[in-house]
Amino acid sequence: MRPIFPFTSIVGQERMKRALVLNAVDPRIGGVLIRGERGTAKSTAARAMAALLPQIEVFVDSPFNDDPHSPNTWSDWVKEQVACGKQLEIRKQQIRFVDLPVSATEDRVVGTLDIEKAIQKGERHFEPGVLAAANRGLLYIDEVNLLDDHVVDILLDSAAMGVNIVEREGISFAHPARFILVGTMNPEEGDLRPQLLDRFALSVEIHGIRDARERVLIMQRNLSFESDPEGFRMEWMPPEQDLSRQIEQARTIVDEVTYTNRDLVSIASLTASLNVDGHRADLVILKTARAHAAFEGRYSINERDIALAAELSLPHRIRRSPFQQAEVTMEDLQERIEQLQGATASQSEPEQVQKQEGASEKKKQ
């Protein structure tokens, strides 16, 4: 196994690192597309993120990396084993980094059902694909713009639904497919269709660092890593462990992060004022804002969370706006949000929105 360059030692590219971290906190955000020239640490950052994440518990013989503590997400295979009274052993493993080749076919991605065996022996046999291996891990697609559009659609559907269902000749098989989706591409080699571009929750455009001092630092760290990979990794172990713990803690509280009606109005007003098509962006901003609040250890979102989420969620979704001439900044978005909130402040007082609406209604009664 080749040594992995530490995530926290990557110089600059803060937006890219932030987008990866927030997807690690909550994979339900829906992945990140990283666009940039060659040699800007795109694949390095993705591999480093997978290595950074804490170990997970899985069933020993399951090819689907099922979570032993989440029965409602178990694959059909685990359900069948449990129904037969089998005791499945549990072990810990490092989160998997799954690299999808550009030549991947639909069957290679989703897996295949053996129809002949089902007809002859009455047995349901499923050969797992890439989505099975990537469950609860990180799925990396280099040059995603060169991948078959239909395959990209399948991947994005699975990332959004969190489950892969394969159906052939009246036979079906389902397994969890919740993963951190990271796609990278060089825009010079062609872009994604707008329909597919919108399906990536977050998008970051990165460039080579122009500051001479930072370029020197990049050279120094890369040379140190090449000469002594293990020593370099040990040097960066403390910040790596700190970030890993912070992500793990954020994962435990992200579902408890609350938001107000005013926050929802701010998000909706922002996307409407920027002529964003559809409603996917609104939901992505909310999920990303909650993940950022959880990452900072807070239980409610604020204007900065929304602005930061919008900075990562909107640039690739806006067709006609100043964002096409100048790079969007979090400060610009936060200022716009404050203006929108000021315009709507007199209309209604913010009311706390709890995830458990039914429970909230009971409390009001």
PLM region spans:
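Short, intrinsically disordered/low-complexity patches at protein termini
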Residues: 41, 57-58, 66-70, 189-190, ...
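Short leucine-rich amphipathic alpha-helices used at interfaces
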Residues: 123, 129, 173, 234, ...
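C-terminal engagement/docking regions of AAA+ P-loop ATPases
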Residues: 41, 268-280, 291-365
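Conserved ASCE/P-loop NTPase catalytic core
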Residues: 1-213
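Short alpha-helix boundary/capping motifs
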Residues: 44, 48-52, 62, 74, ...
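Basic, amphipathic alpha-helical bundle interface domains used for macromolecular binding and assembly
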Residues: 151-152, 210-318
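Short flexible/disordered coil segments
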Residues: 109, 182, 244, 339-345
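Short, flexible loop/turn segments with low-complexity composition
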Residues: 63, 231-236, 323-324
